Regions:
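Heptad-repeat coiled-coil amphipathic alpha-helices that mediate oligomerization/assembly
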Residues: 139-172
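N-terminal assembly/attachment segments of tailed bacteriophage virion structural proteins
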Residues: 1-137, 170-174
């Protein structure tokens, strides 16, 4: 599912970015917060209204001076509709918040939720935000060899079942 998310840069997030720049550093996004309270977000927010889960960013990259791509994996027993997302800096400040009364996704206890975001940060100075991830590559391309092996095993299993079906049919005829 692909939905355009337009997060609101928070006042405290903007201040954190400028403070980092004044010391010669870049602000660092390290976590994604997920919650279930839908609303119209405000620049004055300091946290999600009802945060249900906070996940470390798995991987990320800079697309250009104002755009970053980041991924995360929401796993665990918690179940809820994702209606609010916060992008959290290393110091705990919420840089940006997105929310809507229509849910973005459902976080199931049974299936991990893979999240991927492209954030355009045109309201911030160029290259002022970096991504700090765990190094886990969640790209499907990284899992290509394993997926191909599973697919080959499935096809082999189906071929055995078809062969068995033909044998049963022959026995029933005779």
């Amino acid at each position: 599912m692909s939905k355009a998310l337009i997060p609101v840069i928070t006042t405290r997030g903007l201040a954190a970015v400028f403070n980092a720049q004044n010391t010669g550093l870049s602000a660092e996004i390290t976590h994604i917060a997920l919650g279930d309270h839908g609303r119209t977000p405000s620049k004055n927010e300091v946290g999600l209204v009802n945060e249900r889960m906070r996940i470390a960013i798995a991987d990320g990259e800079r697309i250009d001076d104002y755009q970053i791509h980041l991924t995360g994996l929401a796993d665990g027993d918690t179940e809820f509709w994702v209606r609010e997302i916060g992008f959290i800096l290393k110091d705990g400040t919420m840089l940006a918040v997105w929310s809507d009364t229509d849910p973005l996704a459902y976080k199931s206890a049974e299936v991990p939720l893979l999240l991927a975001f492209d954030l355009v940060l045109a309201a911030l100075p160029a290259n002022s935000v970096n991504i700090i991830g765990t190094g886990a590559n969640l790209s499907l391309a990284a899992w290509g060899e394993q997926l191909a092996a599973v697919a080959a095993a499935n096809v082999d299993n189906m071929a055995r079942h078809v062969e068995l079906l033909f044998r049963v049919n022959d026995l029933e005829k005779g």
